[in-house]
Every structure is written in structure tokens, then in C-alpha cells.
Amino acid sequence: MSNQVNDISYVSLIQVNIVLNKNIILWLGSATPRALRDIDLAQDSVVKIFSFSREPNVVQPWQTTEKEYSSSGFAISGRRILTNAHVVGDHSYLQVRKHGSPTKYKAEVKAFGIFGARRYTFIGETIYALGYPRDGDIISVTKGIVTRVEPQKYAHSSIEILTIQTDACINGGKSGGPVVMGNKVAGVVFENDSPSDK
């Protein structure tokens, strides 16, 4: 699976704006070796996203079943949350919960965006992937190195984008969470079409 905080102060998340990242790669600069302190700061911006959708019953099409999914995202400037398109796309209702809080807040999608590379990562660089594993309420932080940089298709839209692959363990539910290099976001964790890369 290929992967990807910004300092943020939580004033109120009652009217959260979610910004979708279809291209997945958001490069913000070079890393510095203050990893543990930077990871502690990064965790404060990670949110758990709850997506709800109604799925039809094929036997009784007039009945629908509500399904709930959880994934990750992270706060950026302007009271916005950055995540992947597949995390919140095609869902009828969204809620977010910030790190360390039991309260869920209603959220809505405000924009879709395509982000281009500003800095390339290189094979062998250390990264940290953050997010909430599926059915987990505690942020998972996994460390790895960049093992490959290449174009791949994003499973949600089949758009070919430049991605990084890592040996860090990426659990389901972490999708949409940040991948951090030093004190910068290197990208966003996302799903992959190829089962061999997961």
C-alpha cells in the first residue's frame, strides 16, 4: 500500500470542512530528525472519520441498510480536514472525532482537490504512517522506509499518480491519515488496486 500533519489548534469542530485529496500526494518539504517530538505533534491533528451510506437490498429494493465505515484524516489550516476521496465520497452522512475526545461532530465535504508534488521523497528515507486502524480507537503509528517511488493507479478513480511505497505496516482504516517525514507531511495513506502491494 502506498502512503502519505500540519500544526492545528482545535477551536471547535462543529462545522468541519472536509477537503478531499484525489491525487493523494501532498509534498510539503524536507524532513528533519526530530521524529518523536514531531510524531507527538502530528497525532494531535489526526481525526477518525465515520462515513455512513445506505445500501440497497437486492431482494427487496425498497429497503435499504445503513452501513458505517471508519477511516482517518488530519486537520489542516482553516478548520479543514484532509483525507482521501474514497474515505468520504459517495456517503450520505459524515462524522469526525478528534484525537483524545469521545465526541463526534457532523462534517460535510466542501471541496475536491488534486495536489501535485513539491518535493520528491527518495528510496531509503524514513516515514511514519498515522491513522486509526479499522475498529480501533487508538491512533496507530508505524515506522518504515520508502521502498519505491512510481506512478500507480488510485483505486477510487483509476487516475495515475506518483506514489511512494513503504515497508511500514498499513492497516485498513488508516487510509486518509498522514504519512510524516520529520515535521512535514510526505503524503496521505491510500488504497491500492494491487493486492501484492498491501
From Swiss-Prot:
Source superkingdom: Eukaryota
Region (Serine protease): 48-198
Pfam family of the protein (one): Trypsin_2
Residues forming coiled coils: none
Residues of the active site: 86, 175
Record family assignment: Belongs to the peptidase S1B family.
This protein's name: Putative Do-like 15 protein
Originating organism: Arabidopsis thaliana (Mouse-ear cress)
